[in-house]
């Protein structure tokens, strides 16, 4: 099975919160698609609670679009990582990491402004697969953690696992 790009970086050296360009590619029409790793927690040391990350998933995508879309950028998708340490954001365009970090901070400030669970978009059995598994309080705790810390940039060339280590791991 081919090794996915996300598994060629050393998770023990990742900073969090941090932005990382996980992948870039060109479409057949020449558009750039960029996938960002938005790392909320240090891998294997911290994890976002499931109710909080689920609520954040419902809020984050809209708020990020409000702050990042435009000037050659259009968010396609923002999805939580299965390991619950961050989100992947796929977009058309190639914004600088600092622009992404600034939008991320602004989106987290927006999360703190949500006053009631009833304001969470798509929070019903018709539009959400586990609509009862939410916590606005946990989502706001996650947002506050991001706002309380500087967002760094994780560089792939500093995190790439050496070929010897990949061989040792039998990959």
Swiss-Prot record:
Its EC number is 4.4.1.21. It catalyses: S-(5-deoxy-D-ribos-5-yl)-L-homocysteine = (S)-4,5-dihydroxypentane-2,3-dione + L-homocysteine. Keywords: Autoinducer synthesis, Iron, Lyase, Metal-binding, Quorum sensing. Fe cation binds at residues 54, 58, 128. Binds 1 Fe cation per subunit. GO terms for biological process: quorum sensing. Pfam families: LuxS. Its cofactor is Fe cation. InterPro entries: LuxS_sf (IPR037005), Metalloenz_LuxS/M16 (IPR011249), S-ribosylhomocysteinase (IPR003815). The keyword Ribosomal protein does not apply. One of its GO terms (molecular function) is iron ion binding. HAMAP family: LuxS. Belongs to the LuxS family. Homodimer. Involved in the synthesis of autoinducer 2 (AI-2) which is secreted by bacteria and is used to communicate both the cell density and the metabolic potential of the environment. The regulation of gene expression in response to changes in cell density is called quorum sensing. Catalyzes the transformation of S-ribosylhomocysteine (RHC) to homocysteine (HC) and 4,5-dihydroxy-2,3-pentadione (DPD). This is S-ribosylhomocysteine lyase. The lineage of its organism: Bacteria, Pseudomonadati, Pseudomonadota, Gammaproteobacteria, Enterobacterales.
């Amino acid at each position: 099975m081919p090794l996915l790009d996300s598994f060629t970086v050393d998770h023990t050296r990742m900073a969090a919160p941090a932005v990382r360009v996980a992948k870039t590619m060109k479409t057949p029409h020449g558009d750039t698609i960029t996938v960002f790793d938005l790392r909320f927690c240090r891998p294997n040391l911290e994890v976002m609670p499931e109710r909080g990350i689920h609520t954040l998933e419902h809020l984050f995508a809209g708020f990020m679009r409000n702050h990042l879309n435009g000037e050659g950028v259009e968010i396609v998708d923002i999805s939580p990582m299965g390991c619950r340490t961050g989100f992947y954001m796929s977009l058309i365009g190639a914004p600088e990491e600092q622009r992404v970090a600034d939008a991320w901070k602004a989106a987290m400030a927006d999360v703190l402004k949500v006053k009631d669970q009833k304001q969470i978009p798509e929070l019903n059995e018709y539009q959400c697969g586990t609509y009862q598994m939410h916590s606005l309080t946990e989502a706001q705790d996650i947002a506050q953690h991001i706002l309380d810390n500087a967002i760094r940039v994780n560089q792939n060339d500093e995190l790439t696992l050496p070929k010897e280590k990949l061989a040792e791991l039998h990959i």
